[in-house]
Amino acid sequence: MAKRPLGLGKQKQNKKTKVESSSGEVSRESTPVASQIEVELADDVDADDELVQLKGLWQTYFDSDRDSEYVLNGIVHECDRLLREADKEGKIKELSDVFHAIYALALSELTIFKAGEEEDEKKKKEEIAQFFDNALERCSLGESDCGKSDLLDLVKAKVIIQRVPLEHMSALTVSSKSGLNLNTLVEDAKKHFKVSTKDLSLVYEVLEMFDDLLDITENFGHEEQIAEGLDSDDEEDLEPIQLDKKHPVYEMQQNLASNYKWLKEQLIALLGQLNKKDHAKLYHLTAKKIGELYLKDAEEPTNVYLSLAYDDDESKQSSKDCKESQASALKLVQNAIDYLDKAQIEDEPETWAQVAEAYIDLGNLHDNESSEQEKAYQTAETLLTKANTATHGKYDDILENLKQ
């Protein structure tokens, strides 16, 4: 990999002037110059190709902590410059879908910084909306110039999924009754989404954002309690707030189960495209997320089974429901274990412990003192002992409870 400065400094203007572009007005004071940004470029690419440089800059930002509005402004200004040059030369239609995707992604990412800048709520919302509108317009213009593109569709999905909580849900209360149906936006995002092999990391990011959106939807109205520091057990016990049917989030809450199912299906499709050797980190993250979703699916039948199994009601219907919920939960937890096992990382004990805890769940679901239960608990103990040794006693309490 060779590090080299980008060609962002081809702008010959005074730094303190402002330019107006399709992205709105951004001060040049916040825009990097060529000598101030370095990116790593692969040795087998044309380092003088400006699109290659732009891709390198975006990838540098994408792989970073993403705390630099400065770099994002640099990406947007470089996109503006390339667009102006292409327009002068009559070559706009030669700009690739990758160019338009990077432009749109940078605009949508800027909304995160804008959300924390403006104190006037109305003005802030208008500014955020403008950036999202410009990002979606860039996708549409890209498709107009380049034709149908899975990558641009994926970026559209990302922009919409990011927009729902940041622009819309953040301004709502449990008593809101606006005419906006947010579920329509969610369905639109799903319609555009596809596991594009052109950028598998972006695919995972979009799905992770969708998971976050579902979590926000599920806990809507409990934001203050969660912010005050509930532990994971208390958070799981929070009852969903009953929203009015006219509430913008109501339909999203009604569709949580189907959306979690969709999310899991897309993650499984993504995992099928990942080579464990070539995409190790992404492979482990995806497998882990799938396993966690299976565990979430298992919560309801597990609760039903444990409730019925230790209930005094011995009716035939109760016995039937007990067995059905047990079988359903066992299957889901076993599926979770299969994926969490794939997500294990050799030098990360936390991943071993996560598999162990799933085996404990599995053991709890088997008939008491059965050979299957003992086998599940023994597997959990072996993994936890290994993880506990590696972490100098981090899992002492869980191990102690397991041995009782």
Swiss-Prot record:
PANTHER family: ENHANCER OF TRANSLATION TERMINATION 1. The keyword Nucleus applies. It comes from Candida glabrata (strain ATCC 2001 / BCRC 20586 / JCM 3761 / NBRC 0622 / NRRL Y-65 / CBS 138) (Yeast). InterPro entries: Nro1/ETT1. Residues 1-34 are annotated as: Disordered. GO terms for cellular component: nucleus. The keyword Transcription applies. It is found in: Nucleus. Its main location: nucleus. Keywords: Nucleus, Transcription, Transcription regulation, Translation regulation. Required for correct translation termination and probably involved in regulation of hypoxic gene expression. GO terms for biological process: positive regulation of SREBP signaling pathway; regulation of translation; translational termination. It comes from the Eukaryota. Pfam families: Nro1 (PF12753). This is Enhancer of translation termination 1. Belongs to the ETT1 family.
